[in-house]
Amino acid sequence: MSEKIRVLLYYKYVSIENAQEYAAKHLEFCKSIGLKGRILIADEGINGTVSGDYETTQKYMDWVHSDERFADLWFKIDEENQQAFRKMFVRYKKEIVHLGLEDNNFDSDINPLETTGEYLNPKQFKEALLDEDTVVLDTRNDYEYDLGHFRGAIRPDIRNFRELPQWVRDNKDKFMEKRVVVYCTGGVRCEKFSGWLVREGFKDVGQLHGGIATYGKDPEVQGELWDGAMYVFDDRISVPINHVNPTVISKDYFDGTPCERYVNCANPFCNKQIFASEENETKYVRGCSPECRAHERNRYVQENGLSRQEWAERLEAIGESLPEFVGA
């Protein structure tokens, strides 16, 4: 039996001087111990997800904690059967979370060390979910929500996190006087967004401390009131959260049956994320539309080495055709 792999999810807002130099040093250490993952380092802090065996991840956590700036950094740990990443990336960015405030005339960025919402533990957050006078906002991207979310949470009509401030301003009259509670995967986005809500004048703002990842591990709530699975930005794609009465809420793009398997459309110029079973991925050559299925650079066709005849036969089976100039 192969050794278990640990996946570490973490962040911390803290001032990092010479952050670019620190990012290079960080990458060098990670590679020296064989760690895999993706880490963002900015002047405002660090945000990462990494994976490795027990010894490797323990070395990494000990090394990070040995730096007084990160002595109290909170690692959220999952155990898996295989690596969640194939390579090691450490990038320097201007921010570890980009809310897009300065880009969209929303004044200056938020410093969560100065302004942020009240921290709620899993039990308190569950109580908020059941409170009719509390508005619960999902701050993640649309494709994350579609895979899984808290029961009763509002799905803002946005595609990504940077569009959220404008959506709130457009709809603030609906919940300005109510208590507003927000959540995200591990907490890093909510630290900044809840602070922005406070600055916008919302009087009672809370956030799920440690994010969905922590809620699912809490021995008391055990992920209850979460529907579906949680989207993660690594090779796992999704992880279970509700250990009381789990459900599948996402549906196969092609036939509407329950499905939690995310794939990207095979047309590289589309790349839309869709739910699809292996059977339907094969049947529809992973294309989300007739145009994508017949696109000359269809990646499914290339990856599976389909001949032009095999490709054409797949499309004919679903009532479509391959243009003469494609694959000729």
UniProtKB/Swiss-Prot annotation:
* Reactions performed catalytically: uridine(34) in tRNA + AH2 + O2 = 5-hydroxyuridine(34) in tRNA + A + H2O
Span of domain Rhodanese? 130-224
EC number(s) per entry: 1.14.-.-
Molecular function terms, GO-annotated: oxidoreductase activity, acting on paired donors, with incorporation or reduction of molecular oxygen
Q: Which InterPro entries match?
A: Rhodanese-like_dom, Rhodanese-like_dom_sf, Rhodanese_C, TrhO, TRHO_N
Question: Which key words are in the record?
Answer: Oxidoreductase, tRNA processing
- Oxidoreductase is among the record's keywords: yes
Q: Which positions are catalytic residues?
A: 184 (cysteine persulfide intermediate)
Matching PROSITE patterns, A to Z? RHODANESE_3
Tell me the function of this protein: Catalyzes oxygen-dependent 5-hydroxyuridine (ho5U) modification at position 34 in tRNAs.
Q: What is this protein called?
A: tRNA uridine(34) hydroxylase
Lineage of the organism = Bacteria, Bacillati, Bacillota, Bacilli, Lactobacillales
